[in-house]
Amino acid sequence: MKNAARQKDIILLTIDCWRYDSPSRMPRLQAFTEDYDRAEATCQAAATNGVFPSILASTYYPEAYNDSGALHRDVRSLPEVLSDQKYATAGVIGSNPYLGKWSDRFDVFWNDGMNAAEESTNRSEYTNVHRMWNLLRLRPRVTAGEVASRGRKWFQHTSSPKFLWMHLMDLHGPYHPGLRRGLETGLFDAFYSIVQHSRHGRDAPSEVLETIRSLYWECVSKLDEQIAKVLEFIPEDAIVVIMADHGEELYHGFIGHARLYDECVRVPLFVKNAPQNMDNQLVRQLDLAPSLLDWIDVPQPNDWEGMPHSSDREQASYMINHSPLFGGTFTGIRVKNHKLIKYPNKDEPAESEIYDLIEDPAERNPLSDSSVKEELEDRLNKFLQQNNINHESLTHQTGIGGKTKRRLRELGYL
């Protein structure tokens, strides 16, 4: 089966902030993907900057970036491996300042003007007038429709085999679901809550936070209305992967993505035309790129951390997320039935919590004492020590320059 799939086109669609429970509210997506395998993925981080080295290069992000925030030149990425196999490659990104660093790994790359290898040199002609105009229309900066249009144009004018990566930002805060859906929430409440949340974050009044949560779900419904435009041009025999880069925390006292609850690090995964059955599997993002290469019978680079997914093998999912907003680094380990999360605690030793994911899937009640906690804490500490991962090194690797900070603030990272 692998040889028959060797020259198949490959489409990777990633959706920013797409929660694991979102597909149940997306009937059009469900209908369009009726013949897809439906799985879930575990993320190696809780935010865009941390997850894409695992998705595109099967590498934990502290090993992927230099101190300026750029990719190390020797990081071997999926599009580069496919290019060596005579694939044409393109990335179409719905405006994310953290993803410009991948631009030189693709033949063609569009990211709303943010294509520089280092975030600090990224520019985008987007003024306060544009920002206010889109707020008044409750419209995202780049819509799924625009990403689809650019992706379709490249795809239809490029010879096979080809690899297309599209990244949608429609679910990312600030949540702009369009005027029609804003009316359902109440336009005044929508505008007021977006402004208040941007100013005060989790300290905003409870009614503001409730409106913000409602706007997120309206954005999910809005994206569902557009999803056919994103997928309709893809040929029937192509290998297709639809996955979130990370989820979105809504119900643990914070709205956004930084901490390692399953709201952020367990995400939907839809797969079409894979040579193996992926239904109901739980796949590490670290193993996605090796799996894609395995499906087309191409060996993976020796220095990749992951391996082709196998339902017969349980792999621990390690997680690392440095959050400028929280001023610290969250780390964790997720196994089949349990998850351990270590929280930054300023100058004090990190605190940890462990959850039983079977009895407490919403992660509301950390176990008070557990032999499993000690075992997982030992495994996590060994992983961090072996990979020389610490708070100081991750702080330097953010690579955020002044020209990028405005966009990052707009997206809620700072």
What is each stretch, according to the model?
Residues 1-414:
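Catalytic domains that recognize anionic headgroups
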